[in-house]
Curated annotation (Swiss-Prot):
GO molecular function, one term: zinc ion binding
Biased composition range(s): Pro residues: 24-37
Coiled-coil region(s): 69-110
Gene3D superfamilies on file: Phosphatidylinositol 3-kinase Catalytic Subunit, Chain A, domain 1, Zinc/RING finger domain, C3HC4 (zinc finger)
SMART domains (alphabetical): RING
Name of the protein this chain belongs to: Polycomb group RING finger protein 6
Entry GO terms, CC: nucleus; PcG protein complex; PRC1 complex
Main subcellular location: nucleus
Zn-finger segments (RING-type): 135-174
Keywords: Coiled coil, Isopeptide bond, Metal-binding, Nucleus, Phosphoprotein, Repressor, Transcription, Transcription regulation, Ubl conjugation, Zinc, Zinc-finger
Gene name as annotated: Pcgf6
Biological process according to GO: chromatin remodeling; negative regulation of DNA-templated transcription; negative regulation of transcription by RNA polymerase II; regulation of transcription by RNA polymerase II
Ranges annotated as biased composition (Low complexity): 38-51
Length: 351
């Protein structure tokens, strides 16, 4: 009985397996390499073409073994499209970040500007520029701005010229402008004066009106503005003429420093020498220097002036150029010939 049941079970399983195998689709035929077919003879029909056989590139459906490759191509195309979209999104995000940074920068710039949006230049208050356009002598705006070439400080022309009547130093930094002729080292600053006239409203008109009224009240002729002269045809001749005007003669090459060393009690009253820097001709003698000292100090005729250079008592006939050549650099100080002078009572008055 058991053997009969076992055989029935195996038969049942075999019948189920046959039924399941019958339901599966038949396997595809194997693909064989194309055979070399000889060319058909004349009048015979050849084999079907590749397009008729369902080869790739034809209008018919592809064989089932090529379908997975086509599906992979589609997926690959989708991934490439997705990568391009990601790159475009990243570029757009970078552009948006740059635009935000520029907007913040423009906001910072606009916060420092004036209220007017159309006005790009920053307005400056005149009070900030006032120290640069004022004369430190008269405390007013610069008129005929004149600059000292040694220190580049600028003043009104009339103020600085009046100051040099009693001093040879810059009124602002106290530097020595020139030992004897400080007016040699000043120049008109036309550019700065134009700036002052443009900054201060109606300053030029008021100055011209005051000058006109000044001359009119005193019955004087109002000076006309300077007109540039036409340049002559011969430039070489003009250059020579200018050199002859502005060139210092060779004999005016000795600058003196006169130092007072003392006076006897019997010399009486005398005025101190106000300016000890003197520029004279190299051909001038010690006698000329003595006359200069007598006139400036108001000395009595009986008072004798002794002039010394170094350890040498100088004679009246000696010229300054000879003294400088004979004594040498020991008598010089910063390019100046140093002369010491003293006052004594003449021996003729004692007898």
């Amino acid at each position: 009985m058991e053997e009969a049941e076992t055989d029935a079970t195996e038969n049942k399983r075999a019948s189920e397996a046959k039924r399941a195998s019958a339901m599966l689709p038949p396997p595809p035929p194997p693909i064989s390499p194309p055979a070399l077919i000889p060319a058909p003879a004349a009048g015979e029909e050849g084999p079907a073409s590749l397009a008729q056989a369902g080869a790739p590139g034809c209008s018919r459906s592809r064989p089932p073994e090529l379908e997975p490759e086509r599906s992979l191509g589609r997926l690959r195309g989708r991934f490439e499209d997705y990568d391009e979209e990601l790159e475009e999104d990243e570029e757009m995000e970078e552009e948006e970040e740059e635009e935000e940074e520029m907007s913040h920068f423009s906001l910072r710039l606009e916060s420092g500007r004036a209220d007017s949006e159309d006005e790009e230049e920053r307005l400056i208050n005149l009070v900030e520029l006032t120290p640069y356009i004022l004369c430190s002598i008269c405390k007013g705006y610069l008129i005929d701005a004149t600059t000292i070439t040694e220190c580049l400080h600028t003043f009104c022309k009339s103020c600085i010229v009046r100051h040099f009547y009693y001093s040879n130093r810059c009124p602002k930094c106290n530097i020595v402008v020139h030992q004897t002729q400080p007016l040699y080292n000043i120049r008109l600053d036309r550019q700065l004066q134009d700036i002052v006239y443009k900054l201060v409203v109606n300053l030029e008109e008021r100055e011209k009106k005051q000058m006109h009224d000044f001359y009119k009240e005193r019955g004087l002729e109002v000076p006309k503005p300077a007109v540039p002269q036409p340049v002559p045809a011969s430039k070489g001749r003009t250059k020579k003429a200018l050199e002859s005007v502005f060139r210092i003669p060779p004999e005016l090459d000795v600058s003196l420093l006169l130092e007072f060393i003392g006076a006897n009690e019997d010399t009486g009253h005398f005025k101190p020498l106000e300016k000890k820097f003197v520029r004279v001709s190299g051909e001038a003698t010690i006698g000329h220097v003595e006359k200069f000292l007598r006139r400036k100090m108001g000395l009595d005729p009986a008072c004798q002036v002794d002039i010394i250079c170094g350890d040498h008592l100088l004679e009246r006939y000696q010229t300054l150029r000879e003294i400088r050549r004979a004594i040498g650099d020991t008598a010089m100080q910063d390019g100046l010939l140093v002369l010491h002078y003293g006052l004594v009572v003449s021996p003729l008055k004692i007898t």
